[in-house]
């Protein structure tokens, strides 16, 4: 998926020129190349800025070294990047799905961007860390996002369970 986005940004079909399919043209021009901010972006970014120090404190005070090593790198990355998260927001806003499944949870900001466009859509996120779920849930509450459900435990078994209930 990431390579497709890189290709679109670097290809000669920039801004939709040369794309023959109307649906792909609309996707490129209205979603991928769109650079206008949505009102929800500022809400999520405000929560992000308020939680940077709080998150660092949780990682510093946590006794579990394996959790710290596992989450420190992705969390540091999530604190400062938002371009792909805003693309996720635009994709959800464009396609308007009823249910979204996210596998893996770092800080929950990408989950907020998935849940923000449509408060009626259910976003289910699978994570193996109750600590990150607790942290993310507090961020969701401060952002006013209530359409997120968590499945905590072994990611593979949680995924299998969710797929059985969805079908």
Task: Briefly describe each language-model feature range.
Residues 1-167:
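A short alpha-helical cap/connector motif
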């Amino acid at each position: 998926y990431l390579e497709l986005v890189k290709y679109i940004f670097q290809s000669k079909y920039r801004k939709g020129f040369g794309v023959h399919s109307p649906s792909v043209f609309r996707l490129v021009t209205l979603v991928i190349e769109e650079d206008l901010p949505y009102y929800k972006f500022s809400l999520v970014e405000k929560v992000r800025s308020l939680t940077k120090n709080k998150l660092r404190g949780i990682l510093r005070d946590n006794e579990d070294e394996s959790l710290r090593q596992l989450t420190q790198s992705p969390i540091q990355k999530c604190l400062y990047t938002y371009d792909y998260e805003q693309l996720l927001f635009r994709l959800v806003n464009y396609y308007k799905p009823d249910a979204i499944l996210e596998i893996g949870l770092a800080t929950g900001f990408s989950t907020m961007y998935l849940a923000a466009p449509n408060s009626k859509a259910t976003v289910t996120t699978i994570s193996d860390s109750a600590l990150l779920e607790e942290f993310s849930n507090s961020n969701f509450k401060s952002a006013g996002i209530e359409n997120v459900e968590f499945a905590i435990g072994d990611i593979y078994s949680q995924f299998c369970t969710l797929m059985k209930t969805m079908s």
